């Protein structure tokens, strides 16, 4: 049963990673054709399709494009599904609920009862679900602030993206621009690693002490699962970072030859 759980995790990981790796370049090219920086203001992004230059035959317009690490953001989504599968699979090996615990846990929507003890800590909060919806909201907020002319000047994330895109369009040294893109991707990777590590530690610490003492196999299974998820997450972040670097270098070459 434990091996089936791990096989399911690995298959889920490769499924979503393959899908987003194949889909993100097309989405990224489409976004580049819709959004670009304005000539008169470095902090304003025009979202009107009539004001935007097109990318034709692999050539980028000389005014520059707005660079967004869409591959990185969408590439992080598989690991939240991965954590959801891990959380639900780990809970399947727990003991059944008593009627009193089932009645007490039915009043909460985002809590999953794990043990049949009588103390108030017998149910664990599924923080992975809450963090997943928070991540989706964060994505919506970032893209809204980035592509809105009213909020761009007051948002640090959007300003950093605009500076990065400005360096793409105005820099004459390809190596300097490539290093700046790599540094930005590395910073985004570090932020995602830290937030995901906090999620894992929070979910793991939510297991009640009574369950850890009464059923050590549950603690061992969940601990191994969380660590395997972390290892896959870190390895895939490294892969996505190199993928972004080569993709960004391709964009730089297109801008240079346009």
From Swiss-Prot:
Extracellular side: 86-123, 252-258
Compartments where located: Membrane
Transmembrane segments: 65-85, 124-144, 231-251
Any single GO CC term annotated in Swiss-Prot or TrEMBL for this entry: membrane
Taxonomy, superkingdom: Eukaryota
Glycosylation: residue positions: 118
Keywords: Glycoprotein, Membrane, Signal, Transmembrane, Transmembrane helix
Keyword Heme belongs to the record: no
Residue ranges that the UniProt entry lists as topological domain Cytoplasmic: 24-64, 145-230
Leader sequence residues: 1-23
Record keyword Disulfide bond present: no
Membrane-protein topology: Multi-pass membrane protein
Cysteine disulfide links: none
Main subcellular localisation: membrane
Further remarks about this protein from its record: Almost completely overlaps JJJ1.
Protein name: putative uncharacterized membrane protein YNL228W
